[in-house]
Amino acid sequence: MNFDTLKKFDEEIYEVIQKETKRQRGSIELIASENFVTTAVMEAMGSQLTNKYAEGYPDKRYYGGCEEVDVAENLARNRLKKLFNAEHANVQPHSGANANIGVYFATLEPGDTVLGMNLSHGGHLTHGSPVNISGAYYNFVAYGVDSVTHRIDYEEVMRVAQEAKPKMIVAGASAYPRAIDFKKFREIADAVGAYLMVDMAHIAGLVAVGLHQNPCEYADFVTTTTHKTLRGPRGGAILCKEKYAKIIDKAIFPGLQGGPLMHVIAAKAVAFKEALEPGFKAYQEQVIKNAKALGEELKKQGFDLVSDGTDTHLLLIDLRNKNITGKDAERLFDEVGITVNKNTIPFDPQSPFVTSGIRIGTPAVTTRGMKEEEMKKIAGVMNIIIDHPEKVSEAQKVVDELCNQFKLYE
């Protein structure tokens, strides 16, 4: 993209953009929630649509002059519905968190009981963490994973649900590497008369191409981010049954937000169109192949994987046998240009600020064109960093070679 005007007016911000672009080009991005959007998505985000206020919804705006942005929002809504075979879509949430809070606001009263996945077992802040508005406003009861298999025990979820009698059950995770059985969650919700909400933010791209069970078949409400595996701009969306359309739309506007970000909604529409293209399935298939290949090679190098592997795009690594914390590992990897994030593991003895694990994923490296052979090299680099720090120059060389071979935004 051309930043000539910005360079002349605000050299400081121009420098930030240039340095961040250089960082992205010169590092291996393994944070599971990050990806690289296309130039088309960025062009839509940087368009004149950023100038338009459009409170309300298409054909029901509180401002004049919304004819063109109505077209953009309808394109985004219709493409998203087609992508997930959903009855209704709201593309206005500014984030996945706003999408989640919007569903709660539409369906719950303060103090209502909700079942959500324990944050330290792979859930998300907005699934009832006491430091989040979800945990402060609602009575969240947590379910987790089995202490041995580190997988969701659906019989235990049923037991907790029958005991807690929640008004809503939230399924979905931010650090759970295995496929989630939404049909079983529907059965549990029906058994206790609860709404079922699925947060598919991490796996939306996999769901879109049929590589993971589609929650829209089972859930009353499905929330998502539009980035991560979906590879769109940063934002959120809600899918629901048509009978809930009015309460969801009302909860987002005027309930939670004011004016929608029309430039971001246009960029969402572009990303959804990309996801409807045949090549998007091949991309997602490679994401999973890469995650599995990376996991297998890491196991060969002596790393412990939570649940012993992955069905998705992400891996959770237990570093306790390596005698290093997630916090320290994140720093060491960052020094050679491998970006990961420290992450709690199930039943973690460390604090969330230190952690015993790291979370990694393959969406971004797959976007760059890397495949299974490159995953083996990356695993080798990770092993050097943790077990053979005296060979750090070798690791740096491999990182540089991979980044030079697989170009980004050039």
Swiss-Prot record:
GO terms for cellular component: cytosol. The modification N6-(pyridoxal phosphate)lysine is found at residue 228. Keywords: Amino-acid biosynthesis, Cytoplasm, One-carbon metabolism, Pyridoxal phosphate, Transferase. One of its GO terms (molecular function) is pyridoxal phosphate binding. Its main location: cytoplasm. Its EC number is 2.1.2.1. It catalyses: (6R)-5,10-methylene-5,6,7,8-tetrahydrofolate + glycine + H2O = (6S)-5,6,7,8-tetrahydrofolate + L-serine. SUPFAM superfamilies: PLP-dependent transferases. Its cofactor is pyridoxal 5'-phosphate. InterPro entries: PyrdxlP-dep_Trfase, PyrdxlP-dep_Trfase_major, PyrdxlP-dep_Trfase_small, Ser_HO-MeTrfase, Ser_HO-MeTrfase-like, Ser_HO-MeTrfase_PLP_BS, SHMT-like_dom. One of its GO terms (biological process) is glycine biosynthetic process from serine. The record marks 227 as: Plays an important role in substrate specificity. Pathway: One-carbon metabolism; tetrahydrofolate interconversion; Amino-acid biosynthesis; glycine biosynthesis; glycine from L-serine: step 1/1. CDD domains: SHMT. It comes from the Bacteria. Homodimer. Belongs to the SHMT family. This is Serine hydroxymethyltransferase. It comes from Alkaliphilus metalliredigens (strain QYMF). The lineage of its organism: Bacteria, Bacillati, Bacillota, Clostridia, Peptostreptococcales. The gene is glyA.
